[in-house]
Amino acid sequence: MKVSLLAVLLLSIVAATYGQGECGSNPCENGSVCRDGEGTYICECQMGYDGQNCDRFTGANCGYNIFESTGVIESPNYPANYNNRADCLYLVRIKGARVITFTIEDFATEIFKDAVEYGVGPVADFNQALATFEGNLTANNQVPPPFSVQGEQAWFIFSTDRNIPRKGFRITFSSDGDDCTPNPCLNGATCVDQVNDYQCICAPGFTGDNCETDIDECASAPCRNGGACVDQVNGYTCNCIPGFNGVNCENNINECASIPCLNGGICVDGINQFACTCLPGYTGILCETDINECASSPCQNGGSCTDAVNRYTCDCRAGFTGSNCETNINECASSPCLNGGSCLDGVDGYVCQCLPNYTGTHCEISLDACASLPCQNGGVCTNVGGDYVCECLPGYTGINCEIDINECASLPCQNGGECINGIAMYICQCRQGYAGVNCEEVGFCDLEGVWFNECNDQITIIKTSTGMMLGDHMTFTERELGVAAPTVMVGYPSNNYDFPSFGITVVRDNGRTTTSWTGQCHLCDGQEVLYTTWIESSMVSTCEEIKRANKVGQDKWTRYEQSFAPQPDA
């Protein structure tokens, strides 16, 4: 088999650049495969893992992952009955997909017991499910129409109890990506994406499915009078033979059209030539020669004469003016001498005779430089030769002591204290609970503000004038996604204590879960810390599930994000 030099070169380029894309840093974990995209990547996880980088162990005991553009999702053993106590996870990840459409072809599960939930994104979380399906939908003619999700990633969770298994479900899917990436259209064409197809809208001058063909505008022989046609993009150019011009060489050239005759001369056109009839006062082939009126040397006092048509202009030397440069200019007319100095006029110049204690070309320099009191803000002026030096009071700087030194520039106030600049001093206005010249002394623990626990969940506490504490709560996942379930937080602290105890309750998802924290605010190694005990209560549907409805645990909250501890759901 023969391999072209171009193919070898392309393979070399691919080999040299492989691994320099988004997958170059090997972001995918736990044996997953990284698929590079334009500015992004997608991880094809091994069974039992999900998350953007396949870094989250799901604990699923059935299901599978699909990475093709079309496929089928079926319950275990389908069409035979599925197993009891199944906990299945199906990941659908299709690189480059913009829309994934799912069609339920068959569905039969035990209603209120065995449910299928689906959602989008890298993490399968039933709290983020878009819909839930359960029951014998096929037999009851309740199969929903096809539904679609945006993006490259979707997930399905199927869980069963220990009673009455059924045959389960069969769901097919297909995806539509961006068929315009990479752009197949050539020569500046615009690509319009369609469903698993594209259309090229060609730039003027091109045709073909991919606009690969340049239209030959010379095919119609547009050039006349022997002109040679040169094809261009969306146009053509005619190279005319001598004597003709125009877009199509349709015009006989008029040699007088460029108005070659100067100074009002009249042009008479000929064949490839012309002749000029000159006005009086001009001569030459193009009437280019003017009669010289400067021949009589009319300009005086060394002025330079410039000839014009039937006239002349004198360019006078410095110090003279007039039509023929006959007048000496009086440079003292503008009174240039300052501070009472006398002006003596000369030729193109003047001399100032200064009064005592003044000097300079215009008598502008006072020999007593401190006479004008240049030093500001109490600075002391000292004459130094013809200049002065200002000795500034403490707190000021600058040539004239005009700058107030900002003692707050070094940010001396600690722990959020506000710095107020003074003259050669500063004052720190400390936040409540802090003292000292620089607010360096901590006196108590303040509940108000933002706190982070070991999982980097976040609570924000606001204390009202009545003593009640309000605020909100966001999980780390919600912070990462920028979307949070609606929450209501309320609580009360113990009053008039430096290290208060407190209790707060957060209601999430319109009452679906309620979490209560109790604890006390401490100062540990100079840092504010909340140590809390929590209990979480979740709404459930059955008596069996109520055994798992309550969870308890402990949290340590700090003012800064902490290193990750194990996640509760992992």
UniProtKB/Swiss-Prot annotation:
Coiled coil: none annotated. Residues 62-175 form the CUB domain. Disulfide bonds join 23-34, 28-43, 45-54, 62-88, 180-191, 185-200, 202-211, 218-229, 223-238, 240-249, 256-267, 261-276, 278-287, 294-305, 299-314, 316-325, 332-343, 337-352, 354-363, 370-381, 375-390, 392-401, 408-419, 413-428, 430-439, 445-521. It is found in: Secreted, Extracellular space. Residues 18-55, 176-212, 214-250, 252-288, 290-326, 328-364, 366-402, 404-440 form the EGF-like domain. Glycans are attached at residues 30, 136, 357. The keyword Transport does not apply. GO terms for cellular component: extracellular region. Gene3D superfamilies: Avidin-like, Laminin, Spermadhesin, CUB domain. InterPro entries: Avidin, Avidin-like_CS, Avidin-like_sf, Avidin/str, CUB_dom, EGF-like_Ca-bd_dom, EGF-like_dom, EGF-type_Asp/Asn_hydroxyl_site. Residues 443-562 form the Avidin-like domain. It comes from the Eukaryota. Residues 1-17 form the signal peptide. One of its GO terms (molecular function) is biotin binding. Keywords: Calcium, Disulfide bond, EGF-like domain, Glycoprotein, Repeat, Secreted, Signal. Forms the apical lamina, a component of the extracellular matrix. PANTHER family: CYTOCHROME C OXIDASE POLYPEPTIDE VIC-2 (PTHR12916), UNINFLATABLE, ISOFORM C (PTHR12916:SF4). Expressed both maternally and zygotically. This is Fibropellin-3. It comes from Strongylocentrotus purpuratus. The gene is EGF3.
